[in-house]
Structures are given as C-alpha cells and as structure tokens.
Amino acid sequence: MSAHCQVTGRKPGFGNTVSHSHRRSRRRWSPNIQQRTYYLPSEGRRIRLRVSTKGIKVIDRDGIEAVVARLRRQGQRI
C-alpha cells in the first residue's frame, strides 16, 4: 500500500533524524493516510478513497462531488 493521498497528492517526506551526538540516519515521514468511504448522490453509489487528513478537510470544505470532478479532470479513475 502506498502512502499517497488521492486528493492532495501528498507523499512521504524524507530526511535525517539527528541524535543528541549529531549522528544522522535517514528516515521518512509518512502522511496520515486514511481509507474513507464517501457516498456520491449523483451516481447513487459509494466510493472508497485513500486520503490524508488534509484531504479529508478539503472534501469537507469543497464537497465530495467537486473533489471527484476535479480528480476525474486530472485523469484519475474513481
């Protein structure tokens, strides 16, 4: 399973974790990905999306219909 948000496109970030003695080791910061089910009233069906918590806020703000229309314009298959 990839840590990739379908709405915002957010992916893991990479960098170093630095210890007290300043030794560096590589690590990654994964976005908070949730699998959410939304109902599309226009199509009368449910869809399942893998979205970050920021993506959930975008859906709450803009509405699921607008977000799905935007994703389809970008070429994503929903």
Swiss-Prot record:
Keywords from the named record: Ribonucleoprotein, Ribosomal protein
Organism this protein belongs to: Mycobacterium bovis (strain ATCC BAA-935 / AF2122/97)
Top-level taxon of origin: Bacteria
Record-level GO BP terms: translation
Database matches in Pfam families: Ribosomal_L28
Protein's name in the database: Large ribosomal subunit protein bL28B
Transmembrane intervals: none
Alphabetized HAMAP family for the sequence: Ribosomal_bL28
Regions of compositional bias (Basic residues) in chain numbering: 20-29
Recorded GO MF terms: structural constituent of ribosome
GO CC annotation: ribonucleoprotein complex; ribosome
Family: Belongs to the bacterial ribosomal protein bL28 family.
Spans annotated as Disordered: 1-29
InterPro entries referenced in this protein's UniProt entry, alphabetically: Ribosomal_bL28, Ribosomal_bL28/bL31-like_sf, Ribosomal_bL28_bact-type, Ribosomal_bL28_sf
